[in-house]
């Protein structure tokens, strides 16, 4: 049970709620949080962090600060693939957003020489940095350190 607490992502989930609220303010629209969007077969669904069918917007939130592991890169790539699948299945182009909470993450996703960064450019995914409080940053970093201890 102690390990479950150590690997908890409660702080990141809290940060995602705050970031979601800020995204609505930045975009100036009401978004649906974590909707289940069913695909063609009505059995399979995706569940982005935010969505607006009316405004053709879909997005994901990455509440991580600093270097991330390969698994987290795969998570980002998976999130992007889901957004691209939505375009294909719905036969319409959505504005795709990926929200981060640090300049470092924004810069890495937009400007690195990785295939992931190039995919973001080629598929016109907008990386938006949402400012969060220093206190929340510290909570996220503390959680990441705690998770690192249990996951290594």
Give residue ranges: language-model regions.
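Acidic-and-aromatic substrate-binding clefts and catalytic sites of carbohydrate-active enzymes
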Residues: 38-43, 104-108
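Alpha-helical scaffolding within the catalytic cores
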Residues: 43-46, 81
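Residue-level detector of flexible, active-site-proximal loop/helix-junction positions
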Residues: 38-39, 65, 132-136
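Catalytic cores of nucleic-acid endonucleases
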Residues: 62-120
């Amino acid at each position: 049970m102690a390990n479950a607490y150590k690997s908890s992502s409660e702080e990141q989930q809290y940060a995602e709620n705050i970031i979601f609220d800020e995204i609505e303010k930045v975009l100036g629209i009401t978004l649906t949080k974590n909707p289940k969007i069913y695909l063609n077969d009505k059995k399979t669904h995706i569940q982005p962090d935010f969505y607006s069918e009316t405004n053709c917007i879909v997005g994901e939130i990455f509440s991580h600060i600093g270097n991330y592991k390969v698994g987290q890169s795969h998570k980002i790539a998976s999130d992007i693939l889901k957004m691209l699948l939505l375009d294909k299945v719905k036969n319409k182009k959505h504005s795709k957003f990926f929200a981060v909470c640090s300049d470092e993450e924004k810069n890495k996703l937009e400007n690195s020489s990785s295939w992931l960064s190039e995919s973001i450019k080629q598929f016109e995914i907008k990386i938006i940095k949402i400012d969060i409080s220093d206190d929340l940053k510290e909570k996220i970093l503390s959680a990441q350190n705690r998770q690192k201890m249990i996951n290594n």
